[in-house]
Each structure stands twice: as structure tokens, then as C-alpha cells.
Amino acid sequence: MTDYKNKLINLLKENNVIKFGKFTLSSGRESDYYVDMKKAITEPEILDCVAHLITNEIEHDNIDKIAGPALGAVPIATATSLISKKPMLMIRKAKKTYGTSKQIEGELLENDDVVIVEDVTTTGGSLLKAINVIEDNGGNIVKAFVIVDREEGAQETFKENNIEFTPLLTISEFKKYL
């Protein structure tokens, strides 16, 4: 059996996804490392590895849909949907102002059990917004997965909101392999 976690760590290292130095994050905060997940989610081998890790965690659960917030999590949700054979949902940051005016692409039915995926979390705030969109539209979040948790509050955010949160890798775990 493939050890997907070690494979993921090696692929992230090989692709220089986690960079160390001085960086300014989108929030304006300074950080001594940067997680370049856009690079990771455009690599088929990384997506395949991530999709297998998530599918292995949910294969015995009664899951109806795999969801991913736009933009970064859509490739993750797509890959996981392909491996798990579960339909996917794409969650927009805001409702469209044209056409069908949807915020969720894909068919979310009342009481669908949904797994949501994300590329990287810091505090978990943006993923929580996507979770609220699903719940406001009748879906039930069963689990939340993230490729890399920066360990800056996401675990606590999800615990406070009674959401099972599983990082495939934490920044502390990654640093051990350097």
C-alpha cells in the first residue's frame, strides 16, 4: 500500500511548495515561511496523492458530496471527486450577479452530507465562510480537510464550531522532514 502522507511530504519538498524566508501574507502579516499551494494544486501527482489521502479517510463514511471553495480548493475537490466517485460542489466567494445567481455550483440537495476541502488554512476563517454557505443551503458538513494547516488557529476555530477538521499535514510536521 502506498504511504501517501510521506509521498505528499516529498512531493511538496520536491516542488518547493513551502518556502522559508521573509514573506508578507495576503493579510498583510509578516511570516517566516510561505505555503505556495497554487503551485501544488497544479501538479497532477500532488493532486492524486491528496485525493487518495482524503478518500482513504472518508471511504467508509456515508458522504454525498465533496466541496471546495473557489479558487484554490476546486482542483482538490475535483481530484477527490474523481477518486472517491462522489459528485462535487464548487463554492463561490459571493453569489453570481448574472445568470442563475448561484453561489454553489453543482447540485446540493437538502440534508446532503458534505466533505469540504481546502488547500491551506491559517485561522480557518475563509473555510468557515464556505461551510456556512453550504449549511445555509441545506447541506451538512461532515468533515473538513486541508492540505497544510499553518497552525495559527484553524484547529480551534473548527473545534468551537463542532466541525471535524483534518489537516493532511501541519507546518510543524513538514518542518520535521527538512
UniProtKB/Swiss-Prot annotation:
Belongs to the purine/pyrimidine phosphoribosyltransferase family. PyrE subfamily. The lineage of its organism: Archaea, Methanobacteriati, Methanobacteriota, Methanomada group, Methanobacteria. NCBIfam families: pyrE. Orotate binds at T122, R150. This is Orotate phosphoribosyltransferase. It comes from Methanosphaera stadtmanae (strain ATCC 43021 / DSM 3091 / JCM 11832 / MCB-3). 5-phospho-alpha-D-ribose 1-diphosphate binds at R92, K93, K96, E118, D119, V120, T121, T122, T123, G124, G125, S126. Homodimer. Its cofactor is Mg(2+).
